[in-house]
Amino acid sequence: RQIEVMYTPAHTPGSTTFFDKEHHYGFSGDAFGSTNLLLFGGTFKQLIATTSRTASYMQKHGIEKLFPGHYQGNPETLQRILDEKKMSEEVLSGKRKGEKNNTSGLNSYIYDYGVHIRYNAPEALR
């Protein structure tokens, strides 16, 4: 079996995702998949780059699901990766505004498509 590793920073600076192309799935750890994405030191620019690379890889290699480190039974899909990318782009363009809320040491969040993205403003907006 061959496993490919992709650097997927945003949740944390060192986040990685592991892909098994032969079996069409991957393991995303905390980088994706919990419907509660926490940007601990990450930025929306990083998340946009990470979701772009991940979506391209999933499309190219027919990856159907990414299994997260939390919330088993809730795998990440290509559509959710694309939704997270869109949400992030809207935050940086000013089209989407975050809500204030202290959770897990993060002071803001956005919510849509069944996904929370929690972050620290203004750091994550740079």
What does each of the following model-derived ranges do?
Residues E4-D83:
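Metallo-beta-lactamase
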Residues S52-R126:
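Accessory terminal helices/loops
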Residues R1, S34, E90, G94:
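Active-site HxH/HxHxD metal-binding segment of metal-dependent hydrolases
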